[in-house]
């Protein structure tokens, strides 16, 4: 389940720190969050798709490690990103 080119570009533009920024933790976490949300919809219809579930778990763990890195590096950027994406309650 990959993202469409236009939606991916919109996510990158919305979360980028600079003009050509595609690799900052904020952008990576936002892209992973979008893919995770898409896969959650997939699992509502295909609950026994365990092969894709493994990919989902790997994405969640990757996002978790990126968020941990960002929290240790710059706590204000971390809090802003969490609020923007609505990840924590």
From Swiss-Prot:
Q: Which keywords fit this entry according to its UniProt record?
A: Ribonucleoprotein, Ribosomal protein, RNA-binding, rRNA-binding
GO CC, any one term: cytosolic small ribosomal subunit
Q: Which SUPFAM superfamilies match?
A: S15/NS1 RNA-binding domain
Identify the Gene3D superfamilies for this entry: 6.10.250.3130, S15/NS1, RNA-binding
Q: Which Gene Ontology molecular-function terms are recorded?
A: rRNA binding; structural constituent of ribosome
Q: Which domain of life is it from?
A: Bacteria
Entry function: One of the primary rRNA binding proteins, it binds directly to 16S rRNA where it helps nucleate assembly of the platform of the 30S subunit by binding and bridging several RNA helices of the 16S rRNA.
Q: What NCBIfam families is this protein classified in?
A: S15_bact (TIGR00952)
* Binding partners and assembly: Part of the 30S ribosomal subunit. Forms a bridge to the 50S subunit in the 70S ribosome, contacting the 23S rRNA.
Describe the family membership recorded for this protein in Swiss-Prot or TrEMBL. Belongs to the universal ribosomal protein uS15 family.
What is the designated name of this protein?
Small ribosomal subunit protein uS15
Organism equals: Herminiimonas arsenicoxydans
Task: State the taxonomy lineage.
Answer: Bacteria, Pseudomonadati, Pseudomonadota, Betaproteobacteria, Burkholderiales
């Amino acid at each position: 389940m990959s993202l469409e080119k236009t939606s991916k570009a919109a996510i990158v533009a919305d979360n980028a720190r600079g003009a050509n920024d595609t690799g900052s933790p904020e952008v990576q976490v936002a892209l992973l969050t979008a893919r995770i949300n898409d896969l959650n919809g997939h699992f509502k219809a295909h609950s026994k798709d365990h092969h894709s579930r493994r990919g989902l778990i790997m994405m969640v763990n990757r996002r978790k490690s990126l968020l941990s890195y960002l929290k240790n590096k710059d706590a204000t950027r971390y809090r802003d990103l969490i609020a923007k994406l609505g990840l924590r309650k």
